[in-house]
Amino acid sequence: MSATADPRATIDATAVRGTKAQRADALHDLSVAHVELGHLDVAARYAQRGLRLTGEARFHLTLAWIDLDRGRRQQSLAHLDLAAPHLRGRELARARCLRGLHLCHAAEPRLAIAELTAVIKELRRYGDERWLANALIGRGIARCNATQLARADADFTAAQTVLQAIGEHARAAMCLHNRGFVAMLAGDLPLALRRYEDAAKAGLDSTSRPEALVDRAEALLAAGLTTEARRVLTPALELLRRCNRHVPELAVLSARCALRDGDPGPALRLGGSDVEFMLAAGKLDAVAAHRFRGPVQTRALGWLAQARRSDRRGALAACRAGLRLLDEHLGDWPRRELTSHALGLARTAREVLHWAEQHRTSWRSPLPPPNPGLAHALTALRRARALGGPVEALERDVRRLALATGSRGVRETVVLPELPLVSFVVHKGRMRAVTVVNGRARLRDVPHVATLVQEARLAVAAGRPVSAAEALLPDAEEVVVIPDGVLHAMPWAALGRRVHVIPSLRHWRPPRRSRPCRRIWIAGPGLEYEEVPALQQEHGGRRITPFADDVLAAMEGAGVVHIAAHGEVNTDNPLFSHLELKDGPLYGYDIARLEHPPEVVVLSACESGLARAFLDAGTRAVIASVLPVPDARVSRAMTRVHRLIDHPVEAAAVVADLGFSCYGTGTRVAA
């Protein structure tokens, strides 16, 4: 029985008895088993008993590993020094592996890579598979620190293969988790989160490896999913305390997470010279002094502090300066804070419309840029920041490559619709609406919106007329609406108008002539025998097997895509909403990768949260419901929709009684 492959069984089956040699073996097995379970204090006690019993060098090696895991580097090195004179062959190679791991922790990645590369050759020669995996993992960590991400991923993959072959599936799952960390460094947050999830499913036990929770929380926070990040950090903190492990970045990460969730308490308690925490403490003059020097994020925080200490005119100028800086360097934080501050200062209808648009588009996509050079430059910049190194030259590289790459996805050019427009915006609990009709803009407060939405949804569910149009919309047959807050849940088409619902003005596409289109039909698990076969028979087109790769390939360049699949909405970040397919979820970020997104999408079996991902990718119109749709009524409803699909806003209107609306530009000019 292997103490590493099945540590719990080892603990249950092992007794410290017999001869001196048998007792020493038992103590060593128990120590290693408890290391695997993250019980470092217990593991250390068994190893110390073995050391007192025999003085064998293997116990020094085990204690060196335990102390390294605890962050006690000097004690770990002392054990290695004591063991060194007694080591030969395989044991000596293991000690060299531990010294290589020390170099990783000492932020000397190139020395660590060289040392571990030599050790890997030795361990392969001895056939020491478990320690070979240790060395590969260590070299992968060193290559992460050196921003050699492809090679790091290869090392973690190789270690995963070795560990699976010797039956250490929990540690193999940790290697998959490490590959998620590589994806996070590369800027691909969705891939990072997917690998973290896959690692957990593969057997990664976060109770014995709570640092995995810290990695996951960091990715969630970077993706803007602050609530989820805080949920993950809370048990991580308790587990690390129980395991007597020190993760220095945990307190800072926890404070940042709380700060971005509106709780400055932890940041104020940490204090120090961190600019973000100084801003939370109200030290505006000190932070504003950073707006002309230092890393981009520090300068942007300086402009935010300048805005907070200035009069209205100066504050708006400071917000614009901070946003220009972030635009030049593809920066994110504190973009949303800058736009929120400016929105609070906006007075006229045009100002509110402008800053509301800036605020709506203040979330950066968690996808890596399509230009490999830019992706690499951003990776190098992230690592330099993490290690406290110089970043100004790297920021210049990012700016240069960003300007050369340009943007992809939603167009940056804003075209105001010729139709009447209503832009709703919530700021500090207050709902306001900017109405633009015939070029004239008007600003007004909109009270009791939650009640209006609730009454409208109840009316639709009961089959009654909805009476909220007068309170929300101008007197026009056709209107463009940009909702905010609870109004995202409004069944807009049920208000008796032809309503185009868009996330922001950047999503409006001028109407264009219809053209022959390719139709794609997709039915998810449990819905294969519902409306899709009948629709395909009437309208033609291809029916696609509900596997993610097949679905994505079929959607490229399609005219109309009909998806009958259940889904789940993530309100914090729509790119993490998903559809359920046979091989797992199809995320919004998968849709965002489409080079040629479909023209029109119909989501017949899930609520409208995923519409945003299609519109961000470039789809012109999405027909979806804000209410659960009874399966018994879907088939007849979808027949009516597809007979009018060339005019999506009219197609949505005929099924408004089921809560469907048209998201995007739902008008075309007939051929």
Model regions and ranges:
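Catalytic-core segments of thiol-dependent peptidases
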Residues: 484-486, 533-609
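Eukaryotic all-alpha helical interaction scaffolds
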Residues: 14, 18, 34-35, 54, ...
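Amphipathic alpha-helical protein-protein interaction segments
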Residues: 8, 276, 301, 312-496, ...
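Caspase-like cysteine protease fold
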Residues: 569, 575-597, 631-671
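Residue register of alpha-helical TPR repeats
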Residues: 25, 58, 65, 94, ...
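Structural signature of alpha-solenoid helical repeat junctions
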Residues: 22, 55, 91, 131, ...
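Catalytic-core domains of enzymes
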Residues: 482-560
